[in-house]
């Protein structure tokens, strides 16, 4: 039986109905630089809300950078840091040379490297050459802030499936 409901695509533009007040509130919070967490049951339109809000902000002339970090199957701190860094860097760079320069410039003094083989094989822009320490965590989480300062634009990071962090051994 066919179902009229589509669950695997985000709804935006003229197809987006309802939740207008939530879009306005989320947009105002983002413009004010606030951190926002949206936690609802699966398939309730969270990502459609986020996409529509970003769409509205762009239509209103706001410039910003956004990275979507898909945390599905993230089970360790290392996996999180690699996915986070890869998504953040992909939002502002597009060539191996740019990725390599970003790791050198922004993640200096850490255990992160740009490994061309891992990039070609797994599309990972950052790799760890040792177990991550607190300096690695700090520098990686500061990466969007540092990029925003250099670019002079707000930077939004959307963590999809962030509850998976609770499954990491290092969560406690």
Give residue ranges: language-model regions.
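P-loop NTPase nucleotide-binding core
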Residues: 32-35, 40-44, 48-166, 171
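A short, basic N-terminal segment
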Residues: 1-36
